C-alpha cells in the first residue's frame, strides 16, 4: 500500500475528485473507462495513494463533464474552505441554511 497523502491541498483535491464523479453519477469504473485507465487509477487518486499530475487534470476534468477552469475554481474553493478557521466555516454554513 502506498503512502496516503494528507496535506490540505491533497484533501481538497481528493474531495473534489470524488464529489465531481458522484455528481456526474459515475462509478469509478465508468470514469476510468472515459480516461482510458484502470479502475485502480481512479481509486488511488480518490484515496490519496496517487497524485493527479497537473498535466492530467484537464483530461480528468473533461471526463467529469467540466471545463478545466471550473475544475480549478472548485478546487480553489475547497482549498479555501479547508484552510478557513472552523468558526468562520460554521458561520458560512449557518448563513446558507434556510
Kindly label every feature range from the protein language model:
Residues 46, 56, 75:
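DNA major-groove recognition helix of helix-turn-helix
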Residues 49-62:
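Short, basic-rich loop-to-helix N-cap that marks the start of a DNA-contacting helix
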Residues 2, 62, 70-98:
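Short, charged recognition helix plus adjacent turn
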Residues 15-34, 59, 86-96:
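Short basic helix-loop element that most often maps to the first helix and adjoining turn
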Residues 35-52:
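Recognition helix of helix-turn-helix/homeodomain-like DNA-binding domains
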Residues 1-23:
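A short, Lys/Arg-rich alpha-helix, primarily the initiator
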Amino acid at each position: 500500500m502506498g503512502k496516503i497523502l494528507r496535506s490540505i491541498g491533497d484533501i481538497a483535491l481528493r474531495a473534489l475528485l470524488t464529489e465531481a464523479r458522484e455528481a456526474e453519477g459515475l462509478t469509478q469504473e465508468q470514469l476510468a473507462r472515459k480516461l482510458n485507465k484502470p479502475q485502480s487509477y481512479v481509486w488511488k487518486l480518490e484515496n490519496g495513494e496517487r497524485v493527479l499530475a497537473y498535466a492530467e487534470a484537464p483530461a480528468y476534468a473533461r471526463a467529469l463533464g467540466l471545463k478545466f477552469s471550473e475544475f480549478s475554481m472548485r478546487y480553489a474553493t475547497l482549498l479555501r474552505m479547508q484552510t478557513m478557521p472552523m468558526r468562520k466555516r460554521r458561520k458560512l454554513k449557518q448563513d446558507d441554511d434556510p
